[in-house]
Regions:
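Non-catalytic cap/lid and distal C-terminal segments of serine-dependent acyl enzymes
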Residues: 1-328
Length: 328
């Protein structure tokens, strides 16, 4: 069956994000790609990586397809069963939210499953829901699957953040140096917000790590409510806060019998990573796959010869799998 997708934009006035601690907008655009086929279709949520937005996912360039062009091509080739693709905006002024609720950033899980889901289901007839994402979005896909099994029935995790000691620890020194240079968390964030070139090496690594701390180890006693998992003077780990990071690491989540049972009940659990990932996420994917095998949890694990960036072509593999699995 050959068909095409339309692109619609909803305005979501989020009660979950109203009054969030960063002062970020609570009124957001929700981009939805809708198949021009009547009937009830599964909903596939596509979560961008750190610093990403729906605009990034949709953007075309001469050498890479945006998501709308990609799903139209897959549909025309007969590779994609009709599905509704939902692209939520979970960006924050620190660069992201990790798609979870945190008192330091805002209630982004609640935003997804209360505000955005309600808006989509009020407009279209939706079947089962699945989540796909890359990098931080891949992490968010797994986290939301185990925390919201009432909604999520299938997952595709592309180079998702996991095995945190490999993907995060190496970035702690850059944040510690930035805090020393600017005099603490609040002055650093003020300087970052004033910077004209925010994606430069001077800013990107430290603000990304600070954002992770805001998501994983919020602390109301700390500046901006962000608990640092290390001593900024010595880089010595603060075990209590670092353990809070590890508590949401997917390779640890699967050790919880409740989460293992949830993952085992999914219609699809697809995991991949490039063999040359700069954040070492292939190792986390291997560890997760090994633990899933040991627990007898059905999953698909693939590797491919590439690095971390510029791998959106892997959605050619996962989206057809998701759209088929969610119809079972």
């Amino acid at each position: 069956m050959s068909y095409r997708y339309g692109h619609e934009v909803l305005e979501v006035r989020s009660e979950a994000l109203r009054g969030n601690p960063l002062g970020d907008p609570h009124v957001r655009e929700l981009h939805v790609l809708v198949p021009e086929v009547e009937g009830t279709h599964p909903a596939i949520w596509v979560l961008g990586g750190y610093s990403g937005t729906p605009g990034n996912l949709l953007a075309d360039d001469p050498w890479s397809e945006g998501l709308l062009r990609r799903v139209n091509r897959l549909a025309s080739e007969g590779k994609l069963e009709p599905a509704i693709f939902v692209l939520p905006d979970c960006f924050t002024s620190l660069g992201g939210s990790q798609y979870l609720d945190s008192p330091a950033t805002g209630l982004y899980e609640r935003y997804l499953w209360d505000d955005c889901r309600s808006a989509v289901e009020a407009r279209w007839s939706c079947g089962k829901h699945g989540v796909a994402g890359k990098s931080s979005g891949g992490f968010g896909a797994i986290l939301n699957a185990v925390r919201h099994p009432e909604h999520v029935r299938a997952v595709a995790c592309h180079a998702g953040d996991m095995a945190f000691e490999y993907c995060y620890l190496g970035h702690f020194p850059a944040l510690a140096e930035a805090l020393r240079r600017y005099g603490g968390v609040e002055p650093f964030v003020e300087a970052f917000r004033a910077a004209k070139k925010k994606r430069s090496g001077e800013w990107f690594d430290p603000i990304q790590t600070l954002c992770m701390a805001a998501c994983y180890s919020p602390d109301e006693r700390a500046p901006m409510g962000i608990g640092l998992p290390f001593d900024p003077k010595t880089l010595e780990l603060r075990d209590e806060l670092w353990e809070r990071w590890l508590a949401v690491d997917p390779v640890r989540l699967v050790e919880d019998p409740r989460h293992a049972a949830t993952l085992g009940g999914l219609n699809l659990l697809f995991i991949d990573a490039g063999t040359r990932d700069e954040y070492h996420l292939q190792w986390g994917a291997r560890r997760l796959a090994s633990r899933l095998r040991a627990l007898g949890i059905p999953h698909e694990h693939e590797e491919f010869d590439d690095s971390h960036s510029g791998t959106s072509y892997r959605y050619d593999v996962s989206l057809p799998k998701l759209s088929a699995a969610l119809r079972r």
